[in-house]
């Protein structure tokens, strides 16, 4: 599991700046979900092969009321999810009552904590931090996040207890890994148990923190699968509980580890912003995708038609996804999910030869030529595969950086159709060969210079004669 680092502190101590520094090593996946998680941002980062998740919490002052109190509660939830807490304080402001309140809360919870004395710009670190030592934290670091000072050392310190993550077992050992994601109470728990089989006693108690996703290996019709369940640690008797614990950390982990992601939606509630945020995580990761529209039974035909129209309108940008209308409670349509999972897996993990891809590229170019740039045609010469899950196709040519998005979409649609890729995105990377003469002027020899001068004189004489003829 990736270690989870929570940034905790009162407002305006530099948590967001530190968050941006810690996640800049790769594109941060940031979520601001309405309601439940709009006050927490989640990002991913990497340091020397160690991957981690960062949680940027809302500020805590100890005097919150209303929605601010809810935000403070989310910060404490982040502490529970975290493997290590970075308690950020402002060196220039000194110790405040809010700092002391947070320190007390952290001591009660007993989480591994590093005191981060931020904003030490132009100050003696030891002098600036002297007041904070009374809080009793053994681990402390000095940073100036705005200037990126001390951030790397802080990360090294925070990640020190965690070994490098070993890759998951291969396909032969664990089979197809299916990640089940969705917002609370859309029926993930019911679907998980339906997929595993009614007669199976499912006990998902597993050591670890409450944010651990549960990996459940099982067999069906001789095929091996591993179900990555994010619905929470629970026993079968509690599956009917109305309130279901939800964690973006689990969702990110499940998407990252899965071959195929099943996003569960509630047909009766329709598509909400939180569904689209979760969908965005799956798209960002490039995972094969199956949409399971749950609670489809008992709906009127008009309501069903409205749901279909809403899916077309709000999720049209992910047209490659396989869509199933199911009832996890009664089992309707659940068996067909496996068919799509297999199709998606085969497409996501497919291997194609360079010869096959280059021939396909040549056919696509011959049917629809790339546009001209500065009077020269963009050339696409050959293609080869660069990776799987999602499939990555690397196209080599010249001036590829000028290739318009419309032509890239044409290539994606053509490759998808001919290669029969379903359920997974195809990513393209375009590379141009370097021009050795770019930026260089051709220096003429003395003989070439004289020839050029003669030609220029000749051209001038011709122009002069033509001018005289016109004047007559």
Curated annotation (Swiss-Prot):
Residues 440-472 have a biased composition (Basic residues). Keywords: GTP-binding, Nucleotide-binding, Repeat, Ribosome biogenesis. Disulfide bonds: none annotated. GO terms for molecular function: GTP binding; ribosome binding. One of its GO terms (biological process) is ribosome biogenesis. Residues 3-166, 176-349 form the EngA-type G domain. PANTHER family: GTPASE DER. This is GTPase Der. It comes from Hahella chejuensis (strain KCTC 2396). The lineage of its organism: Bacteria, Pseudomonadati, Pseudomonadota, Gammaproteobacteria, Oceanospirillales. The gene is der.
């Amino acid at each position: 599991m990736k270690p989870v680092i929570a940034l905790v502190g009162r407002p305006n101590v530099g948590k967001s700046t530190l968050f941006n520094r810690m996640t800049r090593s790769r594109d941060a996946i940031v979520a601001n979900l309405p309601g439940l998680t709009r006050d927490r941002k989640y990002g991913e980062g990497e340091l020397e092969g160690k991957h981690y998740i960062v949680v940027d919490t809302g500020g805590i002052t100890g005097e919150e009321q209303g929605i601010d109190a809810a935000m403070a509660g989310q910060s404490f939830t982040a502490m529970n999810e975290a493997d290590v807490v970075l308690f950020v304080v402002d060196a220039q402001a000194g110790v405040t009552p809010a700092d002391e309140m947070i320190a007390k809360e952290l001591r009660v919870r007993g989480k591994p904590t590093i005191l981060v004395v931020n904003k030490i710009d132009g100050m003696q670190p030891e002098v600036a931090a002297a007041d904070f030592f009374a809080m009793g934290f053994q681990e402390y670091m000095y940073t100036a996040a705005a200037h990126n000072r001390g951030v790397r050392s802080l990360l090294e310190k925070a990640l020190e207890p965690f070994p490098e993550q070993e890759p998951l077992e291969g396909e032969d050992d664990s089979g197809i890994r299916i990640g089940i994601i969705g917002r609370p109470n859309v029926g993930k728990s019911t679907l998980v148990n339906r997929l595993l089989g009614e007669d199976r006693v499912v006990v998902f108690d597993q050591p670890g923190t409450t944010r651990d996703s549960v990996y459940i290996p099982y067999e069906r019709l001789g095929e091996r699968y591993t179900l990555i369940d994010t619905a929470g640690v629970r026993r079968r008797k509690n599956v009917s509980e109305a309130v279901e614990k939800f964690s973006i950390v689990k969702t990110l982990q499940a998407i990252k580890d899965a071959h195929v992601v099943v996003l569960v939606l509630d047909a009766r509630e329709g598509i909400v912003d939180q569904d689209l945020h979760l969908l965005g995580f799956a798209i960002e990761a490039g995972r094969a995708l199956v949409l399971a529209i749950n609670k489809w039974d008992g709906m009127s035909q008009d309501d069903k038609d409205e749901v279909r129209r809403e899916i077309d309108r709000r999720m049209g940008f992910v047209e490659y996804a396989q869509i199933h209308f199911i009832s996890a409670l009664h089992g309707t349509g659940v068996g067909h999910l496996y068919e799509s999972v297999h199709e998606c897996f085969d497409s996501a993990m497919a291997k194609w030869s360079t010869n096959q891809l280059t021939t396909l590229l040549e056919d696509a170019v011959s049917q629809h030529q790339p546009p001209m740039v500065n009077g020269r045609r963009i050339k696409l010469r050959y293609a080869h595969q660069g990776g799987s899950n999602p499939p990555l196709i690397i196209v080599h040519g010249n001036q590829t950086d000028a290739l318009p998005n419309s032509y890239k979409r044409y290539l994606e649609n053509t490759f998808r159709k001919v290669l029969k890729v379903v359920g997974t995105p195809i990513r393209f990377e375009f590379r141009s060969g370097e021009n050795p003469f770019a930026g260089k002027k051709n220096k003429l020899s003395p003989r070439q210079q004289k020839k050029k001068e003669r030609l220029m004189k000749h051209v001038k004489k011709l122009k002069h004669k033509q001018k005289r003829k016109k004047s007559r």
